[in-house]
C-alpha cells in the first residue's frame, strides 16, 4: 500500500508573504483610528506613548494593492540594521571558517571531553544558565546570534546536533528575557509606564526565572541525550552531515594546530569579551556589534594570511548564505508597516482592551497574556510593545480589579512565544545563520512552547489571588 505524501509546508518566504496578504486584506475592513500620543522620558530616553481614553475614529484609510509590493521594500528600510548585522555575521564566520581556527578549537574541546566524559553533562546547563541570566538582566536578544555560530560546532562535537547548538544561547537568552527579573527593556520600561516602583516584585520574578530556566534546560538536555543515542532522530540530521567541522568526542584525536589558528581564536575570544563589555558598560547596539565582528573577520584573515581577494570571496559567499533570512525579515516587518500605514493598529489595541475588560477578573491577567502574545506577533521589540500597550493596559487593570504589577508580568511573560515567530528578526536571524529551516525548528520548539505557556498561565494565578503589588 502506497503511503500518502506528507503535507509539505511552503517555503518560509511564501508563508510570510501570505501573512502580508492576509493582514492587507484585514486592513481594508478594520476601521481606522488612533490614540493620541505624548512624549515620556524614562531611563534617559524619550519615547512616544499612547494616552489612554483618547482613541478616536478617523476617516478610513484604504491602502492600494501597490502596498503589497511597497511594504516589503519599506521592511528592508525598517530592518536595515539587523539585516546588515546578519550579513556581517555570515561573511565574517565564512572567513573564520577558512582559517580553520574554529574547527581546530572544536577538535581540542572534543579531545578534552573524550578524556573527561563526566564534564560533558555540565555543558548544557551551565551555558544555558549564563545565557538565561544575560536575558534576564540586560535583555540579551540580537546579541545571541554570533554565539549560535560558535555553539553549533561545539554541540556537534559533543555528539548532539545543531538544534542543541542553537538552543544553548538562543533559548537560554529567550527564556531569561521572558521571565526576566531585571530586564530594562521589558520589566523596567513597563513598570515605568505603569507608574509602579522600578524593579519592584523582584523576589517573585526571580522564582519564575529559576523555574523557567530549569524547564528549558531539562527539555534541551532530554533532547540532546536522545540525539546522542541516535543521531538520525535529529530533524536536521542531513543538514548537519553537510557541516564540515563536527568531530565526535568518541573519535577525537589530539592534533597539532598552528600559531595562526591559535591567534585567530584568541582574537575571537577577546572580541567576545569586548562585546560583553561594550553591551553592559557602553550600551552597544547593532552598529557597534557589526563593526566589532567586521574587525574580527578582517584581523583574522590577515593573521591567517588569506589574500584580500580570497577574503572578499569568502565574505560574499557567507553573506549570500544568509540572503534568504534577510528577505524573510523584510517580509515580517512589512506586516507591521501595513497596519501602521492603514492606521488600524490602535483599533486592534482598543478592541483587545475591550475584550479584556469583558472577562471575569479571575482570568483578566490570562486574557492580557494572550492579547500581548497576539500583539507580540506584529511588534517584537519589548520596548516598542510596552510603549504601545502599557499606557492602556495599566489603567485598564485598575478598572478590572487586578494590580498593575500583575499586568506588567502578563506583558513580559508573553515573550515566551518569540522563538517560534517567523516575523521575528531575531528568530529568523538565528535560524538563518544556523541554516536551520524555520519549519523544522518550529516543530521541535512547539512542545517546549506549550509547556512554557502553561507555566506562564499558572504563574499569573498567585498574583491574582494575593493582589500582588509592588514589593
Predicted segments with their positions:
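Membrane-interface alpha-helices at helix entry/exit sites of multi-pass transporters
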Residues: 116-125, 160-168, 200-204, 362, ...
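Hydrophobic alpha-helical transmembrane segments of multi-pass integral membrane proteins
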Residues: 87, 116-150, 329-339, 355-395, ...
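Alpha-helical transmembrane segments and their helix-start/interface "positive-inside/aromatic belt" motifs
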Residues: 4-20, 156-168, 261-264, 316-325, ...
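Long, contiguous bundles of hydrophobic transmembrane helices that form the permeation core
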Residues: 2-13, 38-42, 46-47, 203-314, ...
Amino acid at each position: 500500500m502506497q503511503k500518502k505524501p506528507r503535507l509539505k509546508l511552503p517555503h518560509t518566504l511564501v508563508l510570510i508573504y501570505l501573512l502580508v496578504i492576509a493582514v492587507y486584506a484585514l486592513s481594508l475592513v478594520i476601521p481606522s483610528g488612533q490614540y493620541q500620543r505624548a512624549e515620556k522620558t524614562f531611563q534617559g530616553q524619550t519615547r512616544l506613548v499612547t494616552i489612554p481614553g483618547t482613541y478616536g475614529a478617523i476617516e478610513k484609510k484604504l491602502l492600494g494593492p501597490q502596498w503589497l509590493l511597497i511594504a516589503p521594500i519599506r521592511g528592508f528600510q525598517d530592518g536595515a540594521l539587523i539585516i546588515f548585522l546578519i550579513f556581517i555575521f555570515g561573511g565574517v564566520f565564512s572567513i573564520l571558517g577558512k582559517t580553520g581556527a574554529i574547527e581546530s578549537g572544536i577538535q581540542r574541546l572534543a579531545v578534552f571531553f573524550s578524556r573527561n566524559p563526566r564534564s560533558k553533562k555540565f555543558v548544557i546547563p551551565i551555558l544555558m544558565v549564563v545565557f538565561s541570566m544575560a536575558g534576564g538582566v540586560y535583555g540579551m536578544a540580537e546579541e545571541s546570534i554570533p554565539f549560535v555560530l560558535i555553539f553549533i560546532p561545539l554541540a556537534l562535537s559533543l555528539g548532539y546536533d545543531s538544534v542543541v547548538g542553537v538552543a544553548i544561547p538562543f533559548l537560554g537568552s529567550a527564556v531569561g528575557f521572558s521571565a526576566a527579573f531585571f530586564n530594562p527593556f521589558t520589566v523596567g520600561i513597563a513598570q515605568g509606564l505603569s507608574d509602579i516602583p522600578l524593579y519592584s516584585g523582584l523576589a517573585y520574578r526571580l522564582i519564575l526565572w529559576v523555574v523557567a530556566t530549569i524547564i528549558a534546560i531539562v527539555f534541551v538536555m532530554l533532547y540532546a541525550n536522545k540525539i546522542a543515542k541516535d543521531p538520525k532522530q535529529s530533524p536536521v540530521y542531513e543538514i548537519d552531515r553537510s557541516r564540515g567541522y563536527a568531530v565526535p568526542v568518541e573519535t577525537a584525536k589530539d592534533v597539532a594546530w598552528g600559531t595562526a589558528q591559535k591567534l585567530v581564536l584568541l582574537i575571537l575570544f577577546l572580541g567576545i569579551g569586548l562585546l560583553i563589555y561594550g553591551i553592559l558598560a557602553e550600551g552597544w547596539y547593532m552598529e557597534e556589534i557589526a563593526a566589532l565582528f567586521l574587525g574580527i573577520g578582517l584581523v583574522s584573515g590577515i593573521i591567517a594570511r588569506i589574500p584580500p581577494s580570497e577574503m572578499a570571496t569568502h565574505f560574499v559567499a557567507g553573506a549570500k548564505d544568509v540572503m534568504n533570512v534577510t528577505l524573510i525579515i523584510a517580509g515580517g516587518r512589512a506586516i507591521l508597516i501595513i497596519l501602521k500605514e492603514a492606521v488600524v493598529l490602535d483599533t486592534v489595541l482598543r478592541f483587545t482592551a475591550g475584550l479584556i475588560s469583558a472577562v471575569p477578573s479571575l482570568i483578566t491577567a490570562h486574557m492580557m497574556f494572550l492579547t500581548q502574545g497576539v500583539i507580540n506577533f506584529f511588534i517584537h521589540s519589548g520596548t516598542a510593545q510596552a510603549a504601545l500597550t502599557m499606557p492602556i493596559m495599566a489603567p485598564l487593570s485598575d478598572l478590572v480589579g487586578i494590580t498593575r504589577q500583575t499586568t506588567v508580568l502578563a506583558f513580559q511573560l508573553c515573550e515566551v512565544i518569540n522563538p517560534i515567530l517567523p516575523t521575528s528578526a531575531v528568530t529568523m536571524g538565528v535560524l538563518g545563520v544556523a541554516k536551520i529551516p524555520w519549519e523544522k525548528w518550529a516543530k521541535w520548539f512547539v512542545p517546549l512552547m506549550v509547556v512554557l505557556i502553561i507555566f506562564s498561565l499558572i504563574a499569573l494565578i498567585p498574583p491574582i489571588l494575593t493582589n500582588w503589588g509592588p514589593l
